[in-house]
Regions:
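Hydrophobic structural segments
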Residues: 1-177
Length: 177
C-alpha cells in the first residue's frame, strides 16, 4: 500500500473538503516506500525515532507533527497528519460515532466555529444521572468535571469539545438536562 492510498481513504473519512487547504491535513512528508507497518502517535516524543527503527515502521500518522525532526527519521519514511479533521471527527464535538456509543438520537448541531459544528445535542434513552456518568467514565476512562442534574432522569445531552459557561447556559435553553 502507498501513502497516497491511505490519505485518499482518510480524506474521505475526515471529509477534508469542509476545511480550508491549510487545515485539511494529508501527506506531511511524502514517500514512495510501500507501507506494511503504519505507526500511530499523537505527536513526536523523545523515543519516537528509535521506536520507528525498532518497529520497522514504514510510515507515521501523527496528529500533531509540528515538532517532528524529519532529519532523525530513517530515509523514505512517509508522514501523514490530520489535526483539525481528526479533532472534529474522532474526539468531542459533532461526532456521530460517539453519539452511537452514547445511544444519542435526533442529533442537532450545537455551537459553531468557522461554520463547522463544535458540538451536538441528542436525545438520550431515559436513564439516571448516575448511569450516564458511568457510561461517560467507561467510554473516556474519566471526566474533567460533572455536575448533578436537577432532574433524576437524563433525557437530553450536549457534547461539546470546548464547553464554556455561555454554552452551558445555551444548552440548558435547548432543554439539555
Amino acid at each position: 500500500m502507498q501513502l497516497d492510498t491511505i490519505t485518499k481513504f482518510l480524506n474521505t473519512f475526515f471529509q477534508v473538503e469542509r476545511y480550508n487547504e491549510e487545515e485539511q491535513g494529508g501527506i506531511y512528508l511524502p514517500s514512495t516506500r510501500s507501507i506494511k507497518r503504519l505507526g500511530l502517535a499523537l505527536e513526536p516524543w523523545d523515543g519516537l525515532y528509535n521506536w520507528v527503527k525498532s518497529q520497522h515502521i514504514d510510515a507515521l500518522f501523527l496528529h500533531r507533527p509540528w515538532k517532528l525532526d524529519v532529519e532523525q527519521l530513517p530515509p523514505d519514511i512517509g508522514v501523514i497528519s490530520y489535526h483539525l479533521p481528526f479533532d472534529e471527527s474522532l474526539t468531542l464535538g459533532f461526532n456521530t460515532r460517539l453519539a452511537d456509543v452514547l445511544s444519542l438520537s435526533n442529533l442537532e448541531v450545537f455551537g459553531e466555529k468557522q461554520n463547522r459544528p463544535i458540538g451536538m445535542i441528542g436525545q438520550a434513552p431515559n436513564q439516571s444521572f448516575t448511569n450516564i456518568c458511568n457510561c461517560i467514565k467507561e467510554v473516556f476512562n474519566e471526566y474533567e468535571q460533572i455536575r448533578a442534574a436537577s432532574e433524576s432522569e437524563v433525557k437530553k445531552v450536549a457534547v461539546v469539545g470546548a464547553m464554556t459557561d455561555l454554552l452551558v447556559r445555551e444548552a440548558a435553553s435547548h432543554g439539555v438536562n
